């Protein structure tokens, strides 16, 4: 019990909150996104860095966000609602990857512009998680993304780099990557 004689939320309650995630919408353009008064957390990174898989792992749902071995499968902004049943307490945003993708250059350029606009203008964006393939380290494209969001990070946007694909390396490669 806390000072207000209400039960403290348990760790199980917190886990259940995250695991009631559901697909909300997909959008090819920013003006197609709903305006919601809840915090958004965006997942960004190169094509095939593991953004969709990360969302699925966090929510403990294997097929919430479509994950594929083919780079460039996520071609729109996908929003996932997180919250207790019937409510939206936060949004997880799966953005298209940048860099290598099996799509025409013009489509890649369009995705990159939409993603940059989303990161710079989305009012309820509270955090950005950049997934980085640990076998590659930070690439020139990752550095470009950092420059795009630097002003928002300086204004208080939370930012995290999440290294992925460590399971694909042997011990020596892992030590070198660190």
Spans of features found by a protein language model:
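A general boundary/transition motif marking the beginning of the first structured unit of a protein
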Residues: 11, 103, 169-173
